[in-house]
Every structure is written in structure tokens, then in C-alpha cells.
């Protein structure tokens, strides 16, 4: 009945629970004694495929369990729709706790090879939450391209721990790119947002593409300049409301997640948005993150403030953590404790190539 286990994405003060269904059905999720429907504007969704239901983060954290419920449809008609049976499956959920060391795993740049991400995670070992940092598919000509990110997250978490998602530039390429919004977590329809997991506060930014909107590669299909400006305004809003955001009670660590490491120097083709990205870097001095967590470069790097590779001054290290090679995929383990963050660069071939405190 279910194609995979669910994925529980953290967005703001909510969880977005995504799962695939094999048959037309009405879906809901039960947490404690409360049910949440897969419903839009009063109409229950019924098509098979990806489904997404939002539940309050505080409620699921408290209950530690949720149940996915499907009413399987035999006839979806104008008058007298019929369902044949109800299928339920329950999942234990482990929220991120404050205080104790927290282990996170960041993957990205799989470009369609899901199993390499899974193998790299085994090298790192168990973790408390997952970061999926873009370019899990190479292109998005069809909606099944979005299954790579979902399948990796489902296999690594089994619906039992939180996931943070950042869109990569390759998710913007192809005829299906405009349909991704039914397959990923959003905040009010947007791919940038904040999250709070235990004592860790995070901001997800979305650089969009890696070249200018006018580039011939896109053929007029993108408008990311305005989209980036909107994120500048969003960062300013967070700074104005700092006591309810990154300076909220109990916050011990802050991270910014962005597929593209916008602070890093690039070659001429990829050097875009100087004004906007300089402003983002400046605003980060007010947010004071412990790290910028990125992918995109297909390599490993910890770029500290003052590095000759830095395009702009930065208040924190940039961790570029998804090495992509013919024989293996690299990913990053992160261990948050009171002394900082330990970065482990791990590979799908079982090797750990670096462990460094930042």
C-alpha cells in the first residue's frame, strides 16, 4: 500500500510528513487523538503517488508516534464515491533533544545515485537528524526524478527522525521542475525557511541556479534574481525578530544550510549576484551562525573566515561536504556539542577522510 516509509521534514514549528501511496486513497495522519487530513481547500486529495500532510511539531515531539491512515478508493466519482477498506501503519518518532550531543548526517549531489548516499551514511553511523542538501537528481524531466531525495531520506530515517531539505540547482532543470512543490517541504509555498531541532536553530536558503537568469542554458525558464532578493528581506525579518528566531531561549547552535556555498569564490561563469550575496554574508554577521553547510562543489572543504577562497567576509566556517567522484560519493557527519561542531567527511566506500572541530 505504501511505496516507502514516510519522511518527516521540519519546517518552522511544523513537520511536513511525505509518503507515497500505490493506490488512490483518502489519507490522514493521526497524532495522539488528533487527525490531520490530506485536504486542499476543503477537498480531500485522492490520487496515488506523493502525499504530504502537516502536523504541529510540538504535538509530534510530545507524542513520539504517528499513524498514517489510508481509506482506499474503489470509485472516485461525482456522486457516491466509495472506499473499500482502511489501512493504517504506525511509526515511532524520536525528536531531537536539547542538551546532549546531537549527531546529524548531511548528503547531497547524488545526481541520481541514491545508494551511494545510503552507503556513506553507514560509514558515519547513527544520527539524530538528516540534512538533504540538494542535487539528489541530475535533472527533473519527469516527476519520478523527485523520488531520489525522498527514497534516500525514507531509507535512512524510516520515518522516525526529522529531515531538513534544501533544494539544489539541478532540481530546477527540466519540464518537471515547476512541479516539485508537491514533493518537497515548503513554508507558505517557499523553499527557504527556518527550523528548530532541540537546541539547534537553522536557516535554509535557496540560491536557485548557479548562473545568471539570462544564461542560454535556461532559455528564459528561471527568475531567480527576484527570488534571492526576497530571501534578503526574509533574513532581515528574522534579525528584527531575533528573540523568536536565532536568539530564542535554549538555542545553543545556529547553522545556515544552502546548497550553493554563496560565500565561496567561483570562476567567472558562476560569479553572479555580487550585491545580493554580499548582503547575505553581511546579514550573517548579525545571525552569527556556527557554520554554513553547503554542497554543490563536488568536493570536501572547510573554508574558515579569512580564507583566500572566500568571496566575502564571513562570520563562520563554510563546510562544503559532498565529494562526488566516479568510484564513490562523499558526505558529512556533524556532531553538535557544547564545545562546537565536529565535522566528519565520510565516503560511500567506507572511509572517513577527515574529522575536525570547527
What is the predicted function of each stretch?
Residues 81-133, 138:
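An acidic-aromatic substrate-binding cleft motif
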Residues 71-89, 147-245, 279-280, 302-324, ...:
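Extended active-site neighborhood of metal-dependent phosphoesterases/phosphodiesterases
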Residues 107-111, 136-143, 163, 170, ...:
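The substrate-binding groove and active-site-proximal loops of carbohydrate-active enzymes
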Residues 100-103, 125-130, 158-164, 197-202, ...:
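Loop/turn elements at helix/coil->beta-strand transitions in domains of secreted/extracellular proteins
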Residues 224, 245-291:
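Active-site-proximal segments of metal-dependent phosphoesterases and phosphodiesterases across multiple
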Residues 62, 117-176:
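Core catalytic region of metal-dependent phosphoesterases/phosphodiesterases
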Residues 1-105, 342, 347-358:
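Acidic, histidine-bearing metal-coordination/catalytic regions of metal-dependent phosphoesterases
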Residues 105-109, 129-135, 161-169, 255-259, ...:
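Active-site neighborhood of phospho(di)ester-bond hydrolases with catalytic His/Asp-centered motifs
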Amino acid at each position: 500500500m505504501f511505496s516507502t516509509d514516510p519522511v518527516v521534514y521540519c519546517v518552522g514549528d511544523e513537520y511536513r510528513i511525505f509518503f507515497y501511496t500505490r493506490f488512490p486513497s483518502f489519507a490522514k495522519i493521526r497524532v495522539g487523538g488528533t487527525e490531520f487530513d490530506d485536504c486542499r481547500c476543503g477537498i480531500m486529495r485522492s490520487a496515488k503517488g506523493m502525499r504530504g500532510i502537516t502536523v504541529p511539531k510540538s504535538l509530534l515531539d510530545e507524542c513520539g508516534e504517528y499513524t498514517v491512515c489510508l481509506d482506499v478508493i474503489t470509485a472516485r466519482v461525482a456522486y457516491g464515491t466509495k472506499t473499500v477498506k482502511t489501512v493504517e501503519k504506525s511509526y515511532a518518532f524520536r525528536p531531537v533533544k536539547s542538551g546532549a550531543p546531537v549527531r546529524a548526517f548531511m548528503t547531497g549531489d547524488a545526481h541520481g545515485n541514491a545508494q551511494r548516499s545510503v552507503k556513506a551514511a553507514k560509514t558515519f553511523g547513527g544520527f539524530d537528524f538528516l540534512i538533504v542538501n540538494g542535487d539528489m537528481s541530475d535533472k527533473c524531466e519527469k516527476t519520478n526524478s523527485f523520488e531520489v531525495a525522498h527514497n534516500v531520506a525514507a531509507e535512512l530515517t524510516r520515518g522516525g527522525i526529522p529531515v531538513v531539505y534544501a533544494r539544489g540547482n539541478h532540481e530546477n532543470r527540466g519540464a518537471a521542475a515547476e512541479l516539485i512543490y508537491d514533493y518537497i517541504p515548503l513554508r507558505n509555498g517557499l523553499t527557504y525557511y527556518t527550523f528548530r531541532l532541540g537546541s539547534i536553530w537553522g536557516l535554509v536558503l535557496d540560491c536557485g541556479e548557479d548562473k545568471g537568469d539570462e544564461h542560454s542554458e535556461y532559455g528564459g525558464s528561471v527568475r531567480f534574481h527576484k527570488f534571492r532578493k526576497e530571501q534578503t528581506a526574509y533574513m532581515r525579518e528574522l534579525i528584527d525578530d531575533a528573540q523568536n528566531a536565532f536568539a530564542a531561549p535554549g538555542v545553543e547552535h545556529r547553522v545556515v544550510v544552502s546548497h550553493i556555498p554563496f560565500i565561496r569564490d567561483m570562476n567567472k561563469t558562476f560569479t553572479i549576484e555580487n550585491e545580493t550575496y554580499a548582503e547575505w554574508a553581511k546579514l550573517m554577521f548579525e545571525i552569527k551562525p556556527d557554520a554554513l553547510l553547503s554542497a554543490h562543489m563536488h568536493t570536501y572543504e572547510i573554508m574558515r573566515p579569512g580564507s583566500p577562497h572566500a568571496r566575502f567576509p564571513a562570520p563562520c566556517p563554510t563546510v562544503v561536504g559532498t565529494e562526488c567522484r566516479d568510484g564513490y560519493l562523499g558526505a558529512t557527519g556533524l556532531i553538535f556539542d557544547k564545545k562546537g561542531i565536529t565535522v566528519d567527511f565520510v565516503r560511500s566506500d567506507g572511509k572517513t577522510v577527515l574529522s575536525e572541530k570547527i
